[in-house]
Amino acid sequence: MIEEGGNKRKTMAEKRQLFIEMRAQNFDVIRLSTYRTACKLRFVQKRCNLHLVDIWNMIEAFRDNGLNTLDHATEISVSRLETVISSIYYQLNKRLPSTHQINVEQSISLLLNFMIAAYDSEGRGKLTVFSVKAMLATMCGGKMLDKLRYIFSQMSDSNGLMMFGKLDQFLKEALKLPTAVFEGPSFGYTEHAVRTCFPQQKKIMLNMFLDTMMADPPPQCLVWLPLMHRLAHVENVFHPVECSYCHCESMMGFRYRCQQCHNYQLCQNCFWRGHAGGPHSNQHQMKELSSWKSPAKKLSHAISKSLGCVPSREPPHPVFPEQPEKPLDLAHIVPPRPLTNMNDTMVSHMSSGVPTPTKRLQYGQDMPNLLADEHALIASYVARLQHCTRVLDSPSRLDEEHRLIARYAARLAAEAGNMTRPPTDASFNFDANKQQRQLIAELENKNREILQEIQRLRLEHEQASQPTPEKAQQNPTLLAELRLLRQRKDELEQRMSALQESRRELMVQLEGLMKLLKAQATGSPHTSPTHGGGRSMPMPVRSTSAGSTPTHGPQDSLSGVGGDVQEAFAQGTRRNLRNDLLVAADSITNTMSSLVKELHSGETQRFPLVSSSPSCPLPCPTIPTHSPSFHATFPSRNTRDLHPVPPSHMVSLY
């Protein structure tokens, strides 16, 4: 007894778990019933992971579990409902990556308990097929347009006209959802709900139904449905705007701007709870914004709108054909008798193109005629597909097709049961079943191998996409080395520029010295015995060693230098400039020595006083103070740099 009591309490806790978590979110403080209902149902949708399943996956689950062949008023047990929900979540986990797998057992328990609480309040343990379809189609994810198209297919007849009785039944089932989250007083079912949607009793086609349901505003009883879809779209929208009440620096979700107060904007939490401050009042009209535009985009849009460049708004939904597609005529096809425990497997094998044993189709002598009719129907169906692009888009057509297949399968099973078969048929059926089992086993093994290979490739892709710690550690080192190399490059470029500038200054000094020496040699009245009177100054000897500046050519480095130095250094692009400079300095020194000798021989006759300079190897004449003087700067023979020679090595001539 104690164990039974504990199990009952555990079961009751599981049934109330979703509602306890929903109350913890404190949605009841939202003052507007529409937003309060939409937030609660959105919470249930996300908590049950229904937002990951779209309407097409729901339709596939309905067909896999045979709900499309059942009448809407048929009741199913809770155990079968649990099977349907389990197939939905297990198929969902197959589509999701391994890193985003959901807890299937928990999701099944939450959704099953919520559906029982919403649609089986009396505790009968049974739900109608239409209730299950309406609830799952409303609460699943995906586009609202696709949901409404599927819902209309469940409420329309073969001519594509909506049946108001079916619409009333749908509203009765759909409005049980707000009642389940304690919003029945605001959005409970009433007998006049159909008239609020379609006041005029007239023929309602698909396009008119979509226009009404997707209008702004929508019907009052279903106003929470499009709002729930908008909540899903703006959950992650970021607004870099400060809230005027709570002063948060940014907003997520909806943003509300007052139409009367200047630059007064509220986040969704403050607006939903009715907060207001300053001159703003809750009675002011607010505009709901689901995105943020920069001032530049606003200005561009305003200019485009004023110039008429803004395109017209697209319609809320495409226009669908008024007449529904006619279902396929399968009267000439007699499908094979499905096995009791292999129905789903055989359907999957036939759809995947795997050849199945054809001997099971030979139930009589008219088998060639049946195959001929089947091929003719397939050919006509292919021709129809080539001319119609929306054949496969109609859920009603597929439902009728499955219903027709099931009816012929049942008739074939009844005929086969009444037939008396010879003993050879039993052995043949046994062989056919054995072949089927072998084929199924082979396909299951192959499917298992394919799933393992997919899992392995997925793990390799995830490992390759994630950065390893070694790469993360190498990146700072590489950045530091790159920074040092750039710094070293800048230093070398600065050093090279300084050397080029020093070299140019030295060339300018040499040019001035050579001009001065040439002028002195030309103006001298006496000549040396070893030098003729009209002989010009000897040019420096060119060096044969190769070498050039890496970034500047010879003409660039000698810019601003006179013709004599350029003539001495311009030729020979591959030589050592340092050695050339030393050779040029030696030649100038020799020329100076010759000039001093000539001056000494000439001045000895004019001036009797001669003084000897300790810095000069030859006696130098003492020139009067009024004589012009010049200074020549020579590079030292012991240095190997291109910088100017210090004053201690300078020779002065008077």
Swiss-Prot record:
Zn(2+) 2 binds at C258, C261, H280, H284. Keywords: Acetylation, Cell membrane, Cell projection, Coiled coil, Cytoplasm, Membrane, Metal-binding, Nucleus, Phosphoprotein, Synapse, Zinc, Zinc-finger. The modification Phosphothreonine is found at T11, T69, T179, T212, T424. Scaffolding protein that assembles DMD and SNTA1 molecules to the basal membrane of kidney cells and liver sinusoids. May function as a repressor of the SYN1 promoter through the binding of repressor element-1 (RE-1), in turn regulates SYN1 expression and may be involved in cell proliferation regulation during the early phase of neural differentiation. May be required for proper maturation and function of a subset of inhibitory synapses. This is Dystrobrevin beta. Phosphorylated by PKA. Phosphorylation at Thr-11 alters the interaction with KIF5A. The modification Phosphoserine is found at S394. The modification N-acetylmethionine is found at M1.
